[in-house]
């Protein structure tokens, strides 16, 4: 009974978030803890990414920066949200993380304060993103995808039905109207991510 009431409470709490029609009602904190309203990005194509500096996927920063440089003049903005929930792979302060990313990968896209993307203290933005685009499955054509699938399946055979963020560098693609139009798991080919970005940039 107690679990039922807890589930009901969480459902009621998230209903206003689920009812949102786009990402523009949400606000986030930048590295200096200043509020940034996502409505400031109206008309842009957004790629929202939860990141980490000590992860096997961290080199994706290089590709993300190249994508940003290639498409920013067409309207692409990449929003970087460091998250320490997966293997504690985003340690340190915002300054530590920002210095690492700019020094090692030359990143110039916006980077925000560290957040949680799952659980009781998750960012409301991520509650919304996950509700709009569920888990898409790992790429089973590479060894990392197979490893992650085995890892999560051992913990929960039905893990794929859970929309939660599974690991660092999960990406959500937002169109120019603020709608969440796609999700890319960390094992997704970055060429597919680029193709999604190009298609979104062509949309009116």
Language model regions located:
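Non-catalytic, surface beta->alpha helical segment in thiol-disulfide oxidoreductase systems
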Residues: 182-203
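Amphipathic alpha-helical repeat scaffolds
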Residues: 30, 50-54
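Conserved helix-turn-beta segment immediately C-terminal to the redox Cys motif
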Residues: 44-45, 53-54, 58-82, 101-105
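Thiol-based oxidoreductase modules, predominantly thioredoxin-like and allied folds used
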Residues: 75-92, 108-119
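N-terminal "domain-start" segment that seeds a small globular fold
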Residues: 18-39
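Thiol/selenol-based redox catalytic cores and closely related redox-interacting motifs
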Residues: 106-186
């Amino acid at each position: 009974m107690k679990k039922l009431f807890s589930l009901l409470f969480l459902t009621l709490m998230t209903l206003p978030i689920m009812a949102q029609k786009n990402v523009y009602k949400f606000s986030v904190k930048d590295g200096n803890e200043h509020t940034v309203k996502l409505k400031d990005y109206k008309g842009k194509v957004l790629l929202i990414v939860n990141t980490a500096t000590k992860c096997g996927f961290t080199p994706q920063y290089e590709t993300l920066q190249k994508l940003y440089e290639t498409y920013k003049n067409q309207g692409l903005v990449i929003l970087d949200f460091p998250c320490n929930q997966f293997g504690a792979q985003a340690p340190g302060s915002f300054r530590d993380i920002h210095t690492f990313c700019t020094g090692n990968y030359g990143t110039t896209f916006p980077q925000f304060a560290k957040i949680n993307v799952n659980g009781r203290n998750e960012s409301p933005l991520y509650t919304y993103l996950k509700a709009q685009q569920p888990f898409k499955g790992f790429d089973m054509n590479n060894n990392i995808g197979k490893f992650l699938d085995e890892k999560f399946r051992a913990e929960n055979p039905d893990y794929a039905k859970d929309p939660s963020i599974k690991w660092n560098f999960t990406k959500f693609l937002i169109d120019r109207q603020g709608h969440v139009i796609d999700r890319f798991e960390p094992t997704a080919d970055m060429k597919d991510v680029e193709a999604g970005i190009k298609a979104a940039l062509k949309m009116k």
